[in-house]
C-alpha cells in the first residue's frame, strides 16, 4: 500500500506493517479500513487532527503510533492508559451508522402451471424466508472483531431481526441458531402478535442440561401464518439418533463416530392450507458447520431426505383436517412425493459441495 497526499492506493490487502510517519499527512483516507491484516500502523510526526473511524475495522492491529500529531487529547489518553486495541475499539464503536444494505432480492419460482383465477393464484402463491440469525453466544468480539460492540449486542440485533421478519410478511419463516430462551421469551410472543405460530426444537444436547443451561442452546424455529395454514403435525429429526438406529452405519466405525458426535437437528412441519385444502411439508435444518466434516454434512442431508420421504408418505394417507373453501377441491395424494415440500436451512455448504449436488440433483457420486 502507499499513501499519496491524502489518498490511499490499496495494493496488498495482506499487508501487515504500514509506516507512513513523517509525511506531513493532514488526513488518513477511509480506505485504510480495507487493510484488515495490519498488525502495525505507524503515523508518527504528521499533521493529523483526527483519525478516521475506519481504523476501527483493523481488529488485528497491535501497534498504532500516533505521537507527533495535533490530535484530540482524548485519543492520546486512551492509547496511553489502555493501549492500541482500546483506541481501535473506541474508533470502531464511534463510527457512524452505515447506509443500510439494499433490500434482498426475492427468488421467484414461476412454475409452468395452467392459468389460474385470482383466488387460486392467491391460495397457491406464498413467500418463504430462511435466515440464520446468529445466536448471542456465537456473536463474540473475538469472532467478529471488525464489528462495533453495539452492532453485536443481542438486544440491538434481535429487534432488527424481528423488524426485518415482520416487514417481509412471508407465509413461512425458517430460522436457525435460535436460542431456546429467545424463542419462548421473545420471538414466539412477538410473532404471535403478527399472526404467526411457531415450531421449535433445540439441538440434542439440551436434553442433558439443567433448565438454566438449556435456555442458551440454539436450534431451529419455523413460523407460519395461522390465518393461511393450519398445523397438522410436527416432527423432530435428530441426526445422531437416526444414525444410532442405522445398522449399516455401525459397520463403518469411523463414519458412525463422526456422525454420532454431532447433535444437529431439523424440525418438520406438516400443514394444510385453510382455504384450498392442500398439504405442505416445511423442513428446517441446520447442518454441521466444520468444513473438515463434509462427509457428515452429506450423510445428514441424506438422512433428512430419507426421513422426509417416510413422513411424507404417512402424511399423504392422513385425512384432511381443514374444511376447504367451496371453490376448491382438496387434492388426494397417492404418496408423499406429490405433497409440496420446502427444504430450508443452513447447510453450511457451497455450490461445489456434495450436499448441494445431492439436494439439487438427487444423488452425489461416491468420490465427491
Where are these regions (language model features)?
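Metal-dependent phosphoesterases centered on the DNase I-like endonuclease/exonuclease/phosphatase
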Residues: 192-194, 292-368
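Conserved hydrophobic beta-strand positions in leucine-rich repeat
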Residues: 18-20, 41-43, 64-66
Amino acid at each position: 500500500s502507499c499513501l499519496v497526499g491524502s489518498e490511499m492506493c490499496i495494493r496488498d490487502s495482506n499487508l501487515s506493517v504500514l509506516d507512513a510517519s513523517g509525511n506531513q499527512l493532514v488526513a488518513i483516507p477511509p480506505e485504510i479500513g480495507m487493510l484488515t491484516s495490519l498488525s502495525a500502523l505507524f503515523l508518527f510526526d504528521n499533521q493529523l487532527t483526527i483519525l478516521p473511524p475506519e481504523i476501527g475495522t483493523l481488529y488485528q492491529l497491535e501497534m498504532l503510533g500516533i505521537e507527533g500529531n495535533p490530535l484530540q487529547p482524548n485519543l492520546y489518553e486512551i492509547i496511553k492508559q489502555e493501549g492500541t486495541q482500546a483506541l481501535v475499539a473506541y474508533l470502531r464503536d464511534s463510527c457512524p451508522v452505515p447506509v443500510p444494505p439494499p433490500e434482498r432480492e426475492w427468488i421467484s419460482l414461476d412454475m409452468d402451471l395452467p392459468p389460474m383465477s385470482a383466488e387460486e393464484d392467491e391460495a397457491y402463491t406464498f413467500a418463504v424466508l430462511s435466515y440464520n440469525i446468529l445466536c448471542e453466544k456465537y456473536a463474540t468480539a473475538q469472532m467478529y472483531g471488525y464489528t462495533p460492540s453495539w452492532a453485536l449486542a443481542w438486544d440491538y440485533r434481535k429487534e432488527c431481526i424481528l423488524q426485518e421478519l415482520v416487514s417481509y410478511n412471508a407465509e413461512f419463516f425458517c430460522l436457525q441458531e435460535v436460542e431456546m430462551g429467545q424463542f419462548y421469551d421473545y420471538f414466539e410472543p412477538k410473532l404471535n402478535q403478527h399472526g404467526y405460530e411457531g415450531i421449535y426444537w433445540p439441538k440434542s444436547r439440551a436434553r442433558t442440561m439443567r433448565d438454566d443451561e438449556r435456555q442458551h442452546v440454539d436450534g431451529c424455529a419455523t413460523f407460519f401464518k395461522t390465518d393461511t395454514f393450519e398445523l397438522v403435525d410436527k416432527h423432530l429429526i435428530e441426526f445422531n439418533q437416526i444414525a444410532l438406529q442405522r445398522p449399516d452405519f455401525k459397520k463403518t466405525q469411523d463414519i458412525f463416530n463422526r456422525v454420532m458426535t454431532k447433535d444437529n437437528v431439523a424440525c418438520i412441519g406438516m400443514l394444510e392450507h385453510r382455504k384450498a385444502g392442500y398439504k405442505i411439508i416445511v423442513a428446517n435444518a441446520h447442518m454441521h458447520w466444520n468444513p473438515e466434516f463434509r462427509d457428515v454434512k452429506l450423510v445428514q442431508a441424506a438422512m433428512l431426505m430419507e426421513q422426509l420421504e417416510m413422513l411424507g408418505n404417512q402424511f399423504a394417507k392422513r385425512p384432511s383436517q381443514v374444511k376447504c373453501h367451496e371453490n376448491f377441491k382438496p387434492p388426494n395424494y397417492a404418496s408423499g412425493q406429490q405433497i409440496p415440500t420446502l427444504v430450508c436451512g443452513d447447510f453450511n455448504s457451497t455450490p461445489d459441495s456434495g450436499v448441494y449436488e445431492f439436494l439439487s440433483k438427487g444423488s452425489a457420486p461416491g468420490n465427491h
